[in-house]
Design a protein with these regions (language model features):
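C-terminal binding/interaction regions
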Residues: 2-16, 67-129
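Short loop/turn motifs at secondary-structure junctions and domain boundaries
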Residues: 19-22
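Short beta-strand scaffold segments in enzyme catalytic cores
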Residues: 25-32
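Compact, glycine-rich, soluble single-domain proteins
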Residues: 42-57
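Short, solvent-exposed cationic patches
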Residues: 54-74
Protein backbone atom coordinates (compact mmCIF):
# COMPACT_ATOMS: atom_id res chain seq x y z
CA UNK A 1 0.00 0.00 0.00
CA UNK A 2 1.32 3.45 -0.82
CA UNK A 3 1.75 6.12 1.83
CA UNK A 4 -1.15 8.10 0.34
CA UNK A 5 -3.44 5.06 0.43
CA UNK A 6 -2.50 4.42 4.06
CA UNK A 7 -3.24 8.07 4.88
CA UNK A 8 -6.62 7.79 3.13
CA UNK A 9 -7.43 4.66 5.15
CA UNK A 10 -6.74 6.53 8.40
CA UNK A 11 -8.81 9.55 7.33
CA UNK A 12 -11.71 7.25 6.38
CA UNK A 13 -11.81 6.03 9.99
CA UNK A 14 -12.56 9.53 11.33
CA UNK A 15 -16.23 9.07 10.47
CA UNK A 16 -16.39 5.82 12.45
CA UNK A 17 -15.13 7.33 15.70
CA UNK A 18 -17.55 7.13 18.64
CA UNK A 19 -16.88 10.44 20.40
CA UNK A 20 -19.96 11.72 22.28
CA UNK A 21 -17.84 13.31 25.04
CA UNK A 22 -14.69 14.84 23.51
CA UNK A 23 -16.00 15.37 19.96
CA UNK A 24 -12.37 14.71 18.93
CA UNK A 25 -12.28 12.06 16.17
CA UNK A 26 -9.10 10.13 15.47
CA UNK A 27 -8.48 7.53 12.78
CA UNK A 28 -5.52 5.21 12.39
CA UNK A 29 -4.15 2.83 9.77
CA UNK A 30 -1.42 0.38 10.74
CA UNK A 31 0.74 -1.36 8.14
CA UNK A 32 2.32 -4.70 9.01
CA UNK A 33 5.57 -6.04 7.56
CA UNK A 34 3.64 -8.40 5.27
CA UNK A 35 1.56 -5.51 3.87
CA UNK A 36 -1.60 -6.25 5.84
CA UNK A 37 -3.35 -3.09 7.04
CA UNK A 38 -5.47 -2.74 10.17
CA UNK A 39 -7.54 0.37 10.81
CA UNK A 40 -9.00 1.82 13.96
CA UNK A 41 -10.90 4.74 15.42
CA UNK A 42 -11.23 6.10 18.92
CA UNK A 43 -14.16 4.76 20.93
CA UNK A 44 -15.26 6.66 24.03
CA UNK A 45 -17.25 5.56 27.05
CA UNK A 46 -18.96 7.42 29.90
CA UNK A 47 -16.52 5.58 32.17
CA UNK A 48 -13.62 7.40 30.55
CA UNK A 49 -11.02 4.82 31.55
CA UNK A 50 -12.78 2.38 29.23
CA UNK A 51 -12.11 4.64 26.24
CA UNK A 52 -9.67 3.37 23.61
CA UNK A 53 -7.65 5.41 21.14
CA UNK A 54 -7.60 4.78 17.39
CA UNK A 55 -3.96 3.68 17.43
CA UNK A 56 -4.52 1.01 20.07
CA UNK A 57 -7.69 -0.16 18.33
CA UNK A 58 -5.67 -0.83 15.17
CA UNK A 59 -2.76 -2.41 17.05
CA UNK A 60 -4.97 -4.67 19.16
CA UNK A 61 -6.87 -5.79 16.06
CA UNK A 62 -3.55 -6.67 14.41
CA UNK A 63 -2.16 -8.53 17.41
CA UNK A 64 -5.41 -10.45 17.88
CA UNK A 65 -5.06 -11.63 14.27
CA UNK A 66 -1.48 -12.82 14.78
CA UNK A 67 0.45 -9.80 13.48
CA UNK A 68 3.27 -8.28 15.51
CA UNK A 69 5.70 -6.82 12.97
CA UNK A 70 4.62 -3.24 12.30
CA UNK A 71 6.21 -0.96 9.71
CA UNK A 72 4.24 2.27 10.01
CA UNK A 73 1.08 3.82 11.36
CA UNK A 74 -0.86 6.86 10.18
CA UNK A 75 -2.79 8.86 12.78
CA UNK A 76 -5.38 11.29 11.43
CA UNK A 77 -7.32 14.04 13.15
CA UNK A 78 -9.38 17.07 12.17
CA UNK A 79 -7.52 19.78 14.10
CA UNK A 80 -4.99 22.30 12.78
CA UNK A 81 -2.21 20.58 14.71
CA UNK A 82 -0.73 17.22 13.77
CA UNK A 83 -2.49 14.37 15.54
CA UNK A 84 0.19 12.78 17.72
CA UNK A 85 -0.30 9.67 19.86
CA UNK A 86 -0.90 9.91 23.60
CA UNK A 87 1.51 8.36 26.10
CA UNK A 88 -0.49 5.13 26.42
CA UNK A 89 -0.46 4.60 22.67
CA UNK A 90 3.25 5.38 22.48
CA UNK A 91 3.93 2.78 25.16
CA UNK A 92 1.91 0.12 23.33
CA UNK A 93 3.68 0.95 20.05
CA UNK A 94 7.09 0.77 21.79
CA UNK A 95 6.23 -2.73 22.98
CA UNK A 96 5.97 -3.97 19.40
CA UNK A 97 7.85 -1.65 17.04
CA UNK A 98 10.16 0.97 18.58
CA UNK A 99 11.56 1.89 15.15
CA UNK A 100 8.16 2.11 13.45
CA UNK A 101 7.40 5.14 11.30
CA UNK A 102 4.61 7.30 12.75
CA UNK A 103 2.87 9.57 10.25
CA UNK A 104 0.77 12.27 11.90
CA UNK A 105 -1.87 14.11 9.87
CA UNK A 106 -3.66 17.35 10.60
CA UNK A 107 -7.14 18.31 9.46
CA UNK A 108 -5.80 19.76 6.22
CA UNK A 109 -4.22 16.43 5.26
CA UNK A 110 -0.68 17.63 5.83
CA UNK A 111 1.67 14.96 7.17
CA UNK A 112 4.62 14.96 9.52
CA UNK A 113 6.63 11.76 9.83
CA UNK A 114 8.64 10.56 12.84
CA UNK A 115 10.35 7.45 14.06
CA UNK A 116 8.50 6.32 17.17
CA UNK A 117 11.55 6.99 19.36
CA UNK A 118 11.55 10.64 18.19
CA UNK A 119 8.05 11.43 19.50
CA UNK A 120 8.37 12.04 23.27
CA UNK A 121 8.86 15.82 23.04
CA UNK A 122 5.55 16.21 21.19
CA UNK A 123 2.95 15.86 23.92
CA UNK A 124 -0.83 15.60 23.82
CA UNK A 125 -2.76 17.59 26.44
CA UNK A 126 -6.14 19.21 27.13
CA UNK A 127 -5.38 22.10 24.79
CA UNK A 128 -5.98 19.69 21.87
CA UNK A 129 -9.60 19.11 22.86
Amino acid sequence: MTRDELCQAAVAMLDRAYIPYSHFPVGAALECADGTVFTGCNIENAAYGCTICAERTAIFKAVSEGHRDFVRIVIAGKSEDYCVPCGSCRQVMMEFAPEMEVICLNGQGQAKSFRLRELPPYGFDQSWL
